[in-house]
């Protein structure tokens, strides 16, 4: 069975990581059609053994098609592949029409929250044979926003990790190391982690924070740390190609975004016995079990209030999914005070939370199960289209 992967490889986030891992473990014949003009530098070593075709380039040259022709060329290139299924990875491509002789399947990794409800978006979701969702939240966002006539198939993220065998303990009960890892952009709400650290220090709790990742808000986050007198307690360590050292140095993982379809970094932390503090929004309650291996917090801090406290923008003018009410709602962030209280609760029961994190991870790190479920969902769509 042949799969054509339609993907933009300019960035390097969760979807791209999953894509690379899938290619290494796939049982299908795979072809890659890249819609960006170049690869992200972090992807080059990972993809050097794969043949990548570029949607905007003429044959194997560096010459690009004129912009007005690209949607026609893309449609033709998809058809020329003669793939059983064309899998669109987490973006809305510009197509001239529905490609013939292939099932068109969209794989959502969280971008469906952010697509503007334009004609381009609605036409694309209308021409799909089906979609694959990363979580129940992702499935419901597509159904609620785009009124899909098909029911997206849920295949949760499972990472190829081996959970730790031994739970972590706090070697120094008086000192706690917090960690967060993501792109340093508005919607990740990293300012909350810094304000939370400030709250803990006010409560005479010895804490420090390690922030992994790079992004456009790094300078502003460093200024926020200075403004709140916590600069000496924070390490900005930048992008890490190997996260093992980061996870080995932290005791509690902080996930403070305004939206998160299914947190991969949270899954990685739990597999290492690290409890997670997270907002009860979108797919996070599916990734982490509340009061068991982490603590979920109801977001109560409005975006304008966050801006007042941090001088940081969220840049997320969309709604988020509330799993309790099964509705789309205005985005908010968790309050630094609630975050600090939850950290104290975890500290007081640390050994139990850590062991539970490892136990919970046995399901979320069963990568063979992910491959089976993912390929079953793809195969099902091929059967639907060609029956």
Language-model region placement:
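A short, active-site helix/loop in glycosyltransferases that binds the activated sugar's phosphate group
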Residues: 128-152
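Short hydrophobic beta-strand element within catalytic cores of glycosyltransferases
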Residues: 34, 275-278, 288, 295-296
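A charged, aromatic-enriched C-terminal amphipathic alpha-helix characteristic of glycosyltransferases
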Residues: 321-341, 345-379
């Amino acid at each position: 069975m042949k799969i054509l992967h339609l993907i933009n490889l300019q960035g390097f986030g969760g979807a791209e990581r999953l894509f690379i891992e899938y290619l290494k473990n796939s049982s299908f014949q795979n072809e890659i059609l890249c819609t960006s003009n170049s690869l992200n530098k972090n992807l080059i070593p990972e993809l050097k053994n794969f043949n990548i075709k570029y949607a905007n380039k003429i044959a194997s040259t560096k010459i690009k098609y004129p912009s007005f022709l690209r949607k026609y060329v893309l449609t033709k290139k998809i058809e020329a592949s003669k793939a059983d299924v064309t899998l669109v990875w987490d973006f809305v491509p510009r197509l001239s029409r529905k490609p013939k002789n292939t099932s068109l399947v969209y794989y959502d990794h969280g971008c469906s929250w952010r697509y503007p409800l334009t004609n381009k978006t609605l036409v694309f979701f209308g021409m799909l044979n089906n979609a694959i969702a990363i979580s129940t939240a992702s499935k419901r966002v597509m159904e609620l926003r785009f009124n899909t006539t098909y029911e997206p198939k849920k295949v949760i993220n499972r990472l190829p990790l081996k959970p730790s065998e031994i739970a972590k303990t706090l070697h120094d009960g008086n000192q706690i190391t917090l960690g967060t890892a993501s792109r340093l952009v508005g919607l990740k709400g990293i300012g909350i982690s810094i304000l939370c650290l400030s709250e803990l220090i006010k409560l005479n709790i010895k804490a420090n924070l390690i922030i992994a990742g790079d992004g456009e808000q790094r300078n502003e986050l460093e200024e926020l740390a200075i403004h709140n007198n916590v600069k000496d307690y924070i390490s900005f360590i930048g992008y890490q190609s190997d996260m093992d050292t980061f996870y080995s140095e932290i005791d509690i993982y902080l996930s403070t975004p305004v939206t998160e379809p299914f947190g991969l970094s949270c899954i990685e932390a739990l597999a290492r016995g690290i409890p997670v503090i997270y907002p009860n929004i979108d797919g996070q309650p599916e990734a982490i079990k509340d009061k068991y291996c982490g603590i979920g917090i109801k977001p109560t801090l409005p975006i304008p209030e966050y801006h007042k406290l941090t001088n940081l923008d969220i840049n997320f003018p969309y709604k988020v999914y509330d799993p309790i009410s099964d509705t789309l709602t205005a985005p908010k962030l968790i309050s630094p005070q609630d975050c600090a209280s939850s950290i104290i609760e975890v500290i007081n029961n640390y050994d139990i939370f850590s062991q539970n994190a490892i136990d919970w991870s046995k399901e979320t790190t069963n990568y063979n199960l992910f491959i089976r479920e993912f390929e079953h969902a793809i195969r099902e769509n091929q059967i639907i289209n060609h029956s």
